[in-house]
Design a protein with these regions (language model features):
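Generic secondary-structure boundary/loop-capping signal
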Residues: 26-30, 129
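Structural motif
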Residues: 23-25, 54-56, 91
Length: 173
């Protein structure tokens, strides 16, 4: 990053500190998501913020960037960059890709990201596994499904607070 010590704007820091929810992703882990944590003032505000912090994990690996990564490795990379575990929730895809989709992506060196639910939960993070893939040819997040999961989580948090997991398994699938 240039400059390496780029300052965060006061308005960005204040927006993070005033936020109810901070959502990271989906997107390229090292070129879209992690860069948000490279600016020290932003990273510090994210860690200090009392907002619920949600990471939306990619559904496929990116050749040359996240080869062999499951959801756990994505989360580990975020935590390593932040210097501390800061996430409350991780939304992961648990839907299988079709054989045709898998063949198409194998040619490019891309594989489905494994959900790694238990490994992530051991970090103290609640995992929301759900069927997120679009029914089109490309393996992407279905925007309507993803929006539904996020909105359901927001309503659940408003109604019950951070600690209720019941909805995760019965109503968000």
């Amino acid at each position: 990053m240039e400059p390496a010590d780029a300052p965060a704007t006061a308005s960005a820091v204040q927006a993070i500190l005033n936020a109810d929810i901070l959502i990271f992703g989906p997107g390229s882990l090292y070129t879209s998501v992690i860069p948000n944590l490279l600016v020290t003032g932003i990273r510090d505000a994210v860690i200090k913020s009392e907002a619920v912090k949600i990471y939306i994990c990619n559904v496929m690996t990116q050749p040359g960037e996240t080869d062999g990564y499951g959801a756990f490795e994505h989360v580990q990379a975020l935590i390593q960059q932040a210097g501390t575990q800061f996430l409350d929730y991780v939304i992961v895809n648990d839907q299988r890709v079709t054989a045709a989709q898998l063949a198409q992506y194998n040619e490019k060196g891309s594989m489905p990201v494994t959900p790694d639910i238990k490994k992530i939960e051991r970090l103290g993070i609640q995992v929301i596994p759900t069927r997120l893939i679009s029914n089109k040819d490309l393996v992407r997040h279905n925007p309507q499904k993803l929006a539904q999961v996020i909105i359901s989580l927001v309503y659940r948090l408003r109604l019950f607070g951070k600690g209720i997991q019941f909805f995760d398994y019965f109503f968000m699938r």
